[in-house]
A protein has these predicted regions:
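Short, flexible coil/linker segments at domain boundaries that flank nucleotide/cofactor-interacting
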Residues: 81-82, 163-167, 280-281
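N-terminal beta1-alpha1-beta2 submodule of the flavodoxin-like/Rossmannoid cofactor-binding fold
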Residues: 1-75, 148-274, 330-369
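General detector of N-terminal leader/presequence modules that precede the first folded domain
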Residues: 44-45, 60, 65-92, 96-99, ...
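Long, contiguous alpha-helical scaffold regions
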Residues: 272-366
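A short small-residue
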Residues: 125-134, 248, 321-328
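A generic structural motif
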Residues: 28-36, 116-126, 201-205, 315-324
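Short, glycine-/small-residue-rich phosphate/pyrophosphate-handling segment
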Residues: 84-130, 140-149, 280-320
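Structural alpha-beta junctions
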Residues: 21-31, 79-80, 107-118, 192-199, ...
């Protein structure tokens, strides 16, 4: 069932969205009163609901009718959201807000159980300036690029393949001290319950990964086609091969000033060369975030921005486990932490593992040049 949600939209935006979506929605929701319980049958490991959220923002990055719709979705669709997959189309009257609004919306819906495709956002700012680089490198007009990107995103949504494997591989990346890091300790509580997952851990030590300096586009593409990068090093020798083989990545992220640590951001930035010529659309993204005080959602949203919206990793339901712990080792005393770790491990297993052999077709995808 395809549902189009378009709260408080102008007629021009409605007409544009109708042109961009190559399917006829089964249900269109413009306001909260139209969100009612859905009599949709649910099949195991198959989406019951395909959701397109088309949101037209005002000049402060808001939409007055969206929140009542979201509350109604949580009230009436709490069960079916766990069997849904979604994408966004967001238009802003200025150059701001499309990304920050989208990561906020994705984070909250994901916490309710909604899954998101890789590259889930089609964004529109004035004169489609966000598509300027693609116009320059492809010689295709921006309006045509908008139609092309929209159609590909909707096709990914409607043909979504929840890839399960009898031998799933999980690559875990961290830059933490094994002895004192609360984040690493929480990961080990989770790891105890991942018996059916093939796990490979990578410690990104200080200075081992040089950050991206922004090579010219053609240079980046040249190295990407060779599964390489101008700087080489551990990124090419170890991380890229492991990421290529993995079904999912799990990032262990202590909260540093409400941001991902510099070492891990260097890895994310350096993924760009590989991403130029290879697709991450069939791989899933998980994270564990531990904050000293607050702000775990800020780190989670940074990962959503960088790896789901920009790099194209799928976002499984409730992708992030977050906790608060300040003193070294205090995570082990947090309320219900072992229960939460076990529940998160079950979530990872459900997203990756199947007891019978299947062909993992979801690895296919197009590079996002």
């Amino acid at each position: 069932m395809l549902v189009l949600i378009r709260p408080k939209a102008t007629q021009n935006f409605i007409q544009l969205i109708n042109q961009l979506i190559p399917y006829s929605p089964n249900l269109i929701i413009d306001e909260a009163t139209q969100v009612v319980p859905l009599p949709t049958s649910i099949k195991e490991n198959s989406p019951a609901l395909f959701i397109i959220l088309a949101v037209e923002l005002d000049d402060i990055g808001s939409n007055g009718d969206l929140l009542p719709v979201l509350y109604a979705m949580k009230r009436h669709w709490s069960a079916i959201l766990k069997h849904s997959v979604a994408m966004l189309m967001v238009k802003s009257p200025n150059e701001w807000h499309t990304k920050t609004f989208s990561s906020w919306l994705i984070f909250n819906l994901n916490q309710w159980g909604c899954r998101f495709i890789g590259h889930p956002l089609v964004e529109m700012i004035p004169n489609l300036e966000n598509l300027g680089r693609w116009e320059k490198t492809t010689n295709i007009a921006k309006i045509q690029l908008l139609h092309d990107f929209s159609q590909k995103a909707v096709e990914r949504l409607m043909s979504f393949d929840h890839c399960l494997s009898p031998k799933p591989k999980l690559a875990v990346l961290h830059a933490s001290s094994r002895k004192t890091s609360n984040t690493f300790m929480l990961w080990h509580l989770v790891k105890e319950h991942l018996k059916q997952i093939d796990i490979e851990e990578f410690h990104v030590a200080n200075g081992t990964i040089i950050d991206c300096i922004g090579c010219p586009y053609q240079t980046c593409v040249y190295y990407g086609r060779q599964k390489s990068c101008f700087y080489g090093g551990d990124m090419i020798r170890e991380l890229i091969p492991a990421i290529e083989q993995a079904d999912a990545l799990l990032w262990l992220c202590p909260n540093y000033n409400d941001a991902v640590s510099a070492n891990l951001m260097a890895v994310i930035n350096r993924l760009t060369a590989y991403y130029r010529t290879h697709s991450f659309n069939g791989k899933q993204l998980f994270s564990i975030v531990v904050s000293g005080n607050s702000g775990g959602d800020a780190v989670a949203r940074q990962l959503i921005d960088a790896l789901c919206i920009n790099k194209g990793f799928q976002l499984p339901p409730k992708f992030c486990l977050s906790a608060i712990a300040y003193d070294p080792g205090s995570i082990l005393e947090a309320d219900d932490i072992k229960k939460r770790a076990a529940s998160y491990a079950a979530q990872i297993t459900d997203s990756l593992f199947i007891s019978q052999s299947i062909e993992p077709s979801c690895r296919k995808g197009e590079p996002h040049l």
